[in-house]
């Protein structure tokens, strides 16, 4: 079964030696800050002509954390609409029919296939309010790319601040400073 949600996040490209500042000032009164690390693998899909990339759409199959599954992200003003399906949808890593149907217009009938695999070492800091609701997740990612065919792609580091159900635009502004 698919789920659809709106995703609101800000991303920051940072240098390899960047030191994430303390996040204690972002924790609401009575809230908590919990940190963990994980390794992610995300296989990205597109057409031979990169139709999704040209439209700002991403399609991936992710493993390695609680966000496992198929994710199609479609741009919208200040946010993205994210369509999620479980890993079981899509035999042998093939794009699930449900996502092929949703993206058919964007790819104009072209075949979707794997184009790259991103490996991410993620340190995630979850900020919760006094009731335990997630305000935001701050992810510090070290990313490397392998293109289909085995060529090594770029490596980079980025910090992502994604609002949770209890988050607000003011949190993003404060976190971005």
What does each of the following model-derived ranges do?
Residues 1-177:
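Phosphate-end processing signature that detects enzymes handling 5′-triphosphorylated RNA
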